[in-house]
């Protein structure tokens, strides 16, 4: 018996790995820069609560947070800090529960030299601590 092996003349397309592999934080980044501030604050408080949102913004009580949700303008660098905090939280929330994310934000973190992520986001130079905290969040996701 003679077997004939058919060879296709069609070229196989290369796999587009860059578009098919998950990229943790990409959607979070997009939302952090495009959401209207009241919506961003509302979502952030839904994830981590009003007190932690107020803390990272550097305000003493939640009345400011409530005002921002209603459309009041933030002052100082509160908006920048909250947008970065949202990006971090949104990246983590895709992989864990709000309770775990809150614990991650408020606990000492070995990836950050045993510093607390939320405190860095509140007090640090965002150009320096932003990449550090995002890197620690990605490391947490990768570590499972």
Regions found by a protein language model. Name each.
Residues 1-144:
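Non-transmembrane "mature" sequence context
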């Amino acid at each position: 018996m003679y077997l004939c092996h058919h060879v296709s003349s069609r070229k196989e397309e290369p796999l587009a790995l860059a578009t098919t592999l998950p990229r943790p934080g990409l959607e979070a980044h997009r939302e952090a820069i495009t959401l209207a501030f009241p919506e961003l604050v509302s979502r952030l408080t839904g994830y981590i609560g009003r007190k932690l949102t107020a803390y990272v913004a550097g305000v003493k009580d939640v009345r400011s947070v409530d005002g921002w949700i209603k459309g009041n303008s933030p002052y100082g660098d509160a908006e920048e800090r909250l947008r970065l905090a949202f990006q971090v939280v949104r990246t983590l929330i895709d992989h864990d529960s709000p309770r775990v994310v809150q614990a991650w934000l408020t606990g000492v973190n070995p990836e950050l030299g045993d510093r607390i992520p939320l405190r860095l986001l509140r007090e640090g130079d965002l150009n320096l601590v932003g990449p550090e905290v995002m890197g620690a969040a990605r490391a947490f996701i990768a570590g499972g």
